[in-house]
Curated annotation (Swiss-Prot):
Protein name: Inner membrane-spanning protein YciB
UniProtKB keywords: Cell inner membrane, Cell membrane, Membrane, Transmembrane, Transmembrane helix
InterPro entries registered for this protein in UniProt: YciB
GO cellular component: plasma membrane
Similarity remark: Belongs to the YciB family.
Location(s) in or outside the cell: Cell inner membrane
Role according to the record: Plays a role in cell envelope biogenesis, maintenance of cell envelope integrity and membrane homeostasis.
Matching HAMAP family: YciB
Length: 187
């Protein structure tokens, strides 16, 4: 349900962009994002930090897009948000010496430090890749191509990254599970 709520503004943006235009789509995106935040607060009583970053960026750049009738602002949003996430992951690991991914998921998953570090770097690389490909597509292709990429390309890339993360973690989680079973059998 939560993931569906996160996709609704994007889907509405895409449909309105294809049928009406940039200004209308940007305004629908902003309105849907505000409604999404209200729904998240009512249903889950909490809005995550990454959702706040995305939501504030959507409202800010969406309103600029609507006001100036220029999709460039939403294109910049994708680049800027991906840059923020990549920098946050890298700073957490190299400045604060604790991967952000570990801070977010460390209570749910017990993994060796090197696995957390590789996972953190993998996601930083993913956000950098998305940032670069967004710049290329937004600068060298039409707005329609960019809108398709934003909705389908980035969503597909994100899905691939999540699946890749699962495949990377699977052997480590399996080892952990076996250790726990062995510890349980010796008691």
């Amino acid at each position: 349900m939560k993931q569906l709520l996160e996709f609704i503004p994007l889907i509405l943006f895409f449909v309105v962009y294809k049928t009406y235009g940039v200004q209308e789509a940007a305004l629908v995106l902003v309105a849907a994002t505000v409604v999404q935040f209200i729904a998240l607060q009512l249903l889950y009583k909490k809005i995550e930090k990454n959702q706040w970053i995305m939501g504030i960026a959507v409202v800010f750049f969406g309103l600029l897009t609507a006001y100036f009738n220029d999709l460039a602002f939403l294109k910049w949003k994708v680049t800027i948000v991906n840059a923020i996430f990549a920098v946050a992951l890298l700073v957490s690991q190299y400045v604060f010496k604790k991967p952000l991914i570990q801070m977010l998921l460390g209570k749910e998953l017990k993994l060796p430090q090197n696995v957390w570090e590789k996972l953190n770097l993998g996601w930083a690389g993913f956000f950098i890749f998305c940032m670069i490909i967004n710049i290329i597509i937004s600068e060298f292709f039409s707005d329609d191509v960019w809108a398709n990429f934003k909705v389908f390309g980035l969503t597909g890339l994100s899905l691939i990254a999540v699946i890749g993360t699962g495949l990377y973690l699977y052997p480590h989680l399996k080892q952990l599970e076996q250790k726990e079973e062995n510890n349980g059998n010796t008691n």
